[in-house]
Amino acid sequence: MGILELCDPDVAALRVEGSVADAIRLMLDRHVGAVGVVDSEGRVAGIFTERDVLRKLALTRRDPEATPVRELMTTPVELATTSTTPGEALAIMLERHFRHLPVVDNSSKLLGMLSIRNLLEQRIGDLNQELDSLEQYVTNDGPGG
């Protein structure tokens, strides 16, 4: 399975000119923990996450309506491409303690947002299938069994 297939096809993103309040509303409306922040051509400029809300907004008493998202977004941002494997993405996310990883094309245009949850669900599904196959093999009463 390709990395893009693990992403929500309707990625949550807003332009760098948007406000922090816009980003928070988008996360709440879409039930996601991160939004991609893109420039006028759709290229990833940063990522804004729940952690950014807690670490950069909540304790500073800044007005979310008046604060541009570009001031609080995480940048530079680690990116995955369509050629990144799920295993490589998982390794990056675990090593860097990321819960979200933007997936981009060769022009850095945002295609999807990969979440650690999506990766782990896929991995657990693969392991369950492997376990079922092994169980069937062991319990199969064939020749020599």
PLM segments and residue spans:
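The conserved cystathionine-beta-synthase
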Residues: 13-31, 38, 79-97, 104
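A glycine-centered beta-loop-beta connector
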Residues: 27-30, 35-51, 93, 101-119
